[in-house]
Amino acid sequence: MGKYFGTDGIRGVAGEDLTVELAYKLARAACYKLKDVDNKLIVIGKDTRISGDMLEAALISGITSMGFDVYRLGVIPTPAVAYLTRFYNACCGIVISASHNPYEFNGIKYFSNEGFKLKDSLEEEIEYLIDHQDEIDLKVTGEKVGRVYEEECARDTYINYLLSRVDLDLTGVKVSLDCGYGATSEIAPIIFNRLNADVTVTNTEYDGKNINFKCGSTNPEVISNLVKISESDMGFSFDGDGDRLIACDETGEIMDGDHVICAVGHFLKENNKLKNNAVVGTVMTNIGLIKSLKEIGVDVIKTQVGDRYVLEEMRKNGYIIGGEQSGHIIFIEDNTTGDGILSAIKLAEIAVKSKQKLSEMNNLMTSFPQVLVNAKVNNEYKKVYKDDEVINQKIAELEHEFKDEGRVLIRPSGTEPLIRVMIEGENQEYLEKKAIELKDLIEERCELI
């Protein structure tokens, strides 16, 4: 990670960490790196946060001052921006969103002209120019100044594209949706109504401050309760910017990203459509998923945590399905990033075609309990633990004890002064005890350094 860019763009408290001055400088820096492109067009979308308008105005000022035109897409999911960047042949796309974070946070994320996240090397070059604006030796005046256009067809274009990616009729199927007061609030209900589902919707009346508040993909109990109350056949919950999906079966049981990937993997394998006989997950992927797919001869390729790393592995080796437990699920033949609505209609399509209830698909794997605790350490010590013999000995003892029925994963947080401790196994109470012991040991050893 750099000075400004994290693993998913630039993010922080709007007006404090992420200021209009930074947004303006970022826009100019990125445009300067793109100054030689033929099509000087940039598309911008945003979620429902109150600070979105403020940051959008700053970005547009910077972009147009560099001679680039802007298509304003309005409130629209992140994956829609990735798709529409390609559709409009734009030189890049910008999303203003902080995903699942509270409303006071916001973020700015760029997509390349192909709809992929920017390479680390390009982000580093942009960061340099943010801090060295005097090196942007480009002055635009007169008719060369950029223009701004309201792209009113953007939402319908994206809706029609998603509908074209499935062969699905949900007549007679009850579907519940939790839109988390976010970017899917208008689009998701339209899509499921177009698919003839009997739709029950909650959390769509956004006000700029209620995004993700006690709802959405990080609060799955909401969709579970809605499915039970409405007696729905399936439920889908999205995060603020619409790139995550958490599903729910007809009994109210949650299907996280691992369970969804498991269901998709089984279906593709059974229908001889799973390229390279593997799916892509991360080091946090539940052992239950690995065991379930192994039984049918499917491998799980693991990357470091982050959907960008999952995508890199998929592109590099030709895998077509991958994702994270958190609900980032990538169907690379359909879009270049995680797409919550796409994942939902794909899962519904599999249920209809296989004539299965979601509960049957959910039961294809049994999740091993996972305990996650955070050891608080100073940032300068976040990587020192790797060389500590006492910590490594404790980890080795636990891993030997678990063998193939559990594991220990230690990783430093990319954004906070924390070391995350995850232990996975069969006994929840035992795992909690061992996780706290290891957390305390890490904190103690880091204090001694």
Curated annotation (Swiss-Prot):
The modification Phosphoserine is found at S99. Coiled coil: none annotated. Its cofactor is Mg(2+). Pfam families: PGM_PMM_I, PGM_PMM_II, PGM_PMM_III, PGM_PMM_IV. The keyword Magnesium applies. It comes from the Bacteria. Gene3D superfamilies: Alpha-D-Glucose-1,6-Bisphosphate, subunit A, domain 3, Alpha-D-phosphohexomutase, C-terminal domain. Binds 1 Mg(2+) ion per subunit. Mg(2+) binds at S99, D239, D241, D243. It is an enzyme of class 5 (isomerase). It catalyses: alpha-D-glucosamine 1-phosphate = D-glucosamine 6-phosphate. The active site is at S99. Its EC number is 5.4.2.10. Activated by phosphorylation. CDD domains: GlmM. InterPro entries: A-D-PHexomutase_a/b/a-I (IPR005844), A-D-PHexomutase_a/b/a-I/II/III (IPR016055), A-D-PHexomutase_a/b/a-II (IPR005845), A-D-PHexomutase_a/b/a-III (IPR005846), A-D-PHexomutase_C (IPR005843), A-D-PHexomutase_C_sf (IPR036900), A-D-PHexomutase_CS (IPR016066), Alpha-D-phosphohexomutase_SF (IPR005841). GO terms for cellular component: cytosol. Keywords: Isomerase, Magnesium, Metal-binding, Phosphoprotein. GO terms for molecular function: magnesium ion binding; phosphoglucosamine mutase activity; phosphomannomutase activity. HAMAP family: GlmM_B. Catalyzes the conversion of glucosamine-6-phosphate to glucosamine-1-phosphate. Belongs to the phosphohexose mutase family. NCBIfam families: glmM. This is Phosphoglucosamine mutase. It comes from Finegoldia magna (strain ATCC 29328 / DSM 20472 / WAL 2508) (Peptostreptococcus magnus).
